[in-house]
Amino acid sequence: MSDKEMNVESFNLDHTKVKAPYVRLAGIKTGDHGDAIHKYDLRICQPNKAHMEMPALHSLEHLMAELSRNHTDKMLDISPMGCQTGFYVTLINHDDYDDVLDLIDKTLNDVLVAKEVPACNEMQCGWAASHSLEGAQALARDLLAKRNEWNQVFA
């Protein structure tokens, strides 16, 4: 790891020191008009040890993106990490960490009872063939089983 500070926040995180699963505040940006954008690192898999398979990850993304908005109007985006170990959860004007944990908890519980993956068709999705509701539900179940660990980022 370089001693030089990098522009991308996660590139400055020592991935060998973290212990998934966890939720950490990765950054705050303030807009020109005072809005605060909070980006959270929702890490599901241990970096460089495990990763989510794409169909499960893809379905979990669709499910969380849709279902989280039933619990808050502050959600801007839920986006998967390219390394397939987690998601970035981005909210506007919402700085209550415990409430973010509750939001993720409620959303994952919604995933467990979902009957289908939202927007899982060629009109609404760029890779509609790559989905697994069962895989997404298994990820949600495993993550919820470790709910008491989410606030512990480092080993």
Swiss-Prot record:
Keywords: Autoinducer synthesis, Iron, Lyase, Metal-binding, Quorum sensing. It is an enzyme of class 4 (lyase). Fe cation binds at residues 58, 62, 125. InterPro entries: LuxS_sf, Metalloenz_LuxS/M16, S-ribosylhomocysteinase. Its EC number is 4.4.1.21. The keyword DNA damage does not apply. One of its GO terms (biological process) is quorum sensing. It catalyses: S-(5-deoxy-D-ribos-5-yl)-L-homocysteine = (S)-4,5-dihydroxypentane-2,3-dione + L-homocysteine. Its cofactor is Fe cation. Binds 1 Fe cation per subunit. GO terms for molecular function: iron ion binding; S-ribosylhomocysteine lyase activity. It comes from the Bacteria. Belongs to the LuxS family. Homodimer. NCBIfam families: PRK02260.1-4. Involved in the synthesis of autoinducer 2 (AI-2) which is secreted by bacteria and is used to communicate both the cell density and the metabolic potential of the environment. The regulation of gene expression in response to changes in cell density is called quorum sensing. Catalyzes the transformation of S-ribosylhomocysteine (RHC) to homocysteine (HC) and 4,5-dihydroxy-2,3-pentadione (DPD). This is S-ribosylhomocysteine lyase. It comes from Chromohalobacter salexigens (strain ATCC BAA-138 / DSM 3043 / CIP 106854 / NCIMB 13768 / 1H11).
